[in-house]
């Protein structure tokens, strides 16, 4: 796995740091966090690199700007072909599985099913809990996010009630802004001109969360966390990209 770097971004917990310190021994790991981090990095192994940055003045809605800056800071320092971005307050195992997926399908961005929303619930809403792809594509994604945050672009989305168009509202969800920024950068001639679900299937796919056990998923907005027991459909999330087209996207599989 020498051609992939794990980027751990944002606020770092001791639990997350200890987990990856124990499990990531044969490939590069970059921690991109803030100068006020209290973790002791004195015994850092040679495959780990830590970047401590000043906290941006503007957090953005749901800390979108924090995520963008910390991720981009990491991406701009790595040299590997692939990158896997995770949060500093979660952990996932079997990163070899993600690496295998990237080598088989390098053109897509591979995302976790954690709050990857159905189209009826929230258009253009991938998961930002795990984002994996080529370093080139992730740089395109987060540079576009940074540009759009700085310029105020991508702040408007459609709001639906009972599946029907209702009004335009300010986009607060970081995941929507990430998705739309990337698609606008990669496919400007198609974005918002063709069915967004088709475009999402072309550029994204969803990882199998069961293959990432043991894991810890955390939702700060809801003050909830899961250890190996996050069921996507029970949490208004989809497990496969084709569920974007489903009339019953949150039906629990095999039930």
Please annotate each region the language model reported.
Residues 68, 88-102:
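Acidic donor-binding/catalytic loop of UDP-sugar-dependent glycosyltransferases
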Residues 34, 86-88:
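Active-site acidic Asp-centered loop
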């Amino acid at each position: 796995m020498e051609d992939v770097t794990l980027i751990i971004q944002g606020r770092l917990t001791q639990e997350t740091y200890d987990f990856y310190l124990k499990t990531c021994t044969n490939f590069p790991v970059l921690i991109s966090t803030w100068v006020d981090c209290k973790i002791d990095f004195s015994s850092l192994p040679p495959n780990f690199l830590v970047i401590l940055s000043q906290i941006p003045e503007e957090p953005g809605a749901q800390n979108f700007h924090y995520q963008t800056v910390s991720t981009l800071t990491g991406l701009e320092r790595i040299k590997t072909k692939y990158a896997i971005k995770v949060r500093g307050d979660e952990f996932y195992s079997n990163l070899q599985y993600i690496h295998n997926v990237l080598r088989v399908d390098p053109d897509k961005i591979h995302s976790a099913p954690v709050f990857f929303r159905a189209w009826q619930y929230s258009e253009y809403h991938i998961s930002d809990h795990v984002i994996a792809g080529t370093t080139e594509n992730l740089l395109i994604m987060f540079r576009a996010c940074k540009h759009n945050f700085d310029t105020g672009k991508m702040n408007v989305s459609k709001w639906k009630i009972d599946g029907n168009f209702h009004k335009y509202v300010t986009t607060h969800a970081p995941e929507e802004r990430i998705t739309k920024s990337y698609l606008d950068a990669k496919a400007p001639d198609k974005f918002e001109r063709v069915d967004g679900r088709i475009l999402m299937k072309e550029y994204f796919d969803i990882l199998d969360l069961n293959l990432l056990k043991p894991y810890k998923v955390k939702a700060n907005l809801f003050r909830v966390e899961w250890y190996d027991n996050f069921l996507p459909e029970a949490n208004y999330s989809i497990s496969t990209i084709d569920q974007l087209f489903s009339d019953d996207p949150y039906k629990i599989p095999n039930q």
